[in-house]
Design a protein with these regions (language model features):
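Active-site acidic carboxylates
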Residues: 2-110, 126, 156, 173-177, ...
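Acidic, metal-coordinating catalytic cores used for nucleic-acid/nucleotide bond scission
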Residues: 84-87, 111-114, 139-143, 168
């Protein structure tokens, strides 16, 4: 009999409705509902990036792109929008739609909060999803405003802090505090990937590993070292087999 402290190992190639997870783990009930998720990537614009001070813009862009790639890989619906893209806020970063061609762009008419735009809200509601993963720039405005409103309307809301950016550390910290008070869940891009990943016993595991490399350069170094070690081991084995022959 398996106990809570014993690992569960599945046979090679076993497929289940949870992509290799034989049953719904107890802990899964507190994680993102992967069957009910919509991703909102809001106002990742070149002009707004120039005012981001709480995270490097390179890291922010990499994390936002990783989320878009995750959505494309796992067929998570995505809605994007931009705030006055023809003005000083600048255009939406192209990487998002390049990584997730299925993403739906909703134009706005100047509303600061995407949730104040009727077409945007209509597009969200038409998906039928009630779990929202939101990232954007600025965190304290473009993420917080729709996040708080959606939460008040009954949505489960996750705010991806490191795929978002703010003009200062103080702005980011106070926003996270307000999220927590309102019941919005602060989360990292890495955690989002992990909560959708759940198990290495799945055919797209290598592609998911690539996403970890995007959000963690150190993980990329680890994977490179592992791959090289595998190559050396294979060469050594081949030489040994040739010598015996």
């Amino acid at each position: 009999m398996n106990t809570a402290d014993e690992p569960i190992f599945l046979p090679d190639g076993q497929n289940t409705i949870h992509d290799g997870i034989e049953h719904e783990p107890t802990g899964g009930k507190g994680l993102i509902d992967t069957t009910d998720t919509l991703m909102l990537l809001l106002d990742h614009q070149s002009g707004l990036f120039q005012n981001v001070k709480d995270i490097s813009v390179a890291e922010l862009r990499a994390n936002a792109t990783a989320l878009a790639k995750l959505a494309a890989l796992l067929q998570i619906p995505v809605i994007t929008t931009a705030s006055v893209p023809d003005g000083p806020n600048g255009p939406l970063m192209p990487e998002i739609h390049e990584a997730a061609p299925h993403a739906v762009y909703v134009p706005r008419k100047g509303e600061v909060s995407a949730w104040d735009n009727a077409l945007f809200v209509k597009t969200v509601r038409e998906t039928g999803k009630k779990t929202l993963i939101i990232a954007g720039v600025w965190t304290s405005v473009c993420v917080m405003f729709p996040a708080l409103t959606a939460k008040a309307e009954g949505y489960k809301v996750y705010a991806v802090i490191d795929a978002s950016g703010d003009p200062s550390e103080m702005a980011s910290r106070t926003t996270i505090a307000r999220f927590i008070q309102a019941g919005v869940v602060p989360i990292s891009a890495n955690a989002v990937i992990c909560e959708f990943h759940r198990t290495w016993n799945r055919p797209d595991a290598a592609q998911l590993a690539d996403l970890y490399c995007m959000v963690s350069p150190n993980y990329r170094a680890l994977m490179e070292s592992f791959q090289r070690a595998e190559e050396v081991a294979k060469k050594t084995m081949t030489k040994a087999q040739t010598a015996r022959a």
